């Protein structure tokens, strides 16, 4: 019985020494503890808007930090292009028939990390339209950084579905210049409104 107890005690001493072998040692001048590092990595996406730099004048993109995320104010506008607005204007080629287009450049910066592919697109859609029937959101038809030369360079931005305005294959972290505007039609009668109006455009970055 005594022999069994002695063997057990020695065994426990050996286990204790092994437990601390990495952090302390005797009869040596080096010790090598180990540290296991753990982290849960997630993929991430970001799409930011900012004031443009390409056109002659720019309507400021204001970061609200909430809902809506950004705002842009075109100022006072009219269908004949009498008011200058806050940025750029293409007056109607045929007043009383064609719309006046007030427009501005803006920048989009997509950033994505940890994705299994770099294929991506950016879309835009009017998700809340103007109440006024004589006002609509327009975008540059070319989807490029080239400054539009006339009203003909603009087309109505989609309301029922989103329009692709960049991609596929946009580079992460690179700002893109695009153009957006408000078209004021020379209409009269029911549904034609004046005064302050607003619409909401939703931009979507998809990496797939």
Residue map of PLM features:
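A periodicity- and composition-biased signal for non-globular, repetitive helical segments
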Residues: 8-9, 145, 184
């Amino acid at each position: 019985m005594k022999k069994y107890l002695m063997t057990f005690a020695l065994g426990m001493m050996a286990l204790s020494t092994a437990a601390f072998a990495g952090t302390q040692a005797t009869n040596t001048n080096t010790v090598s503890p180990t540290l296991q590092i753990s982290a849960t990595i997630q993929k991430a996406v970001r799409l930011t808007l900012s004031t443009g730099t390409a056109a002659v004048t720019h309507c400021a993109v204001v970061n609200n930090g909430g809902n809506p995320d950004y705002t842009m104010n075109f100022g006072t506008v009219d269908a004949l292009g009498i008011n200058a607005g806050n940025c750029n204007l293409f007056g109607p080629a045929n007043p009383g028939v064609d719309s006046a287009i007030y427009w501005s450049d803006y920048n989009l910066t997509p950033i994505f990390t940890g994705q299994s592919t770099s294929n991506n697109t950016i879309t835009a859609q009017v998700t809340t339209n103007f109440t006024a029937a004589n006002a609509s959101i327009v975008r540059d038809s070319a989807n490029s950084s080239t400054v539009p030369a006339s009203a003909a360079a603009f087309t109505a931005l989609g309301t029922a579905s989103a329009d692709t305005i960049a991609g596929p294959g946009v580079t992460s972290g690179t700002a893109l210049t695009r153009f957006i505007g408000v078209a004021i039609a020379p209409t009269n009668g029911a549904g034609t409104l004046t005064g302050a109006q607003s619409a909401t455009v939703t931009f979507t970055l998809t990496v797939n």
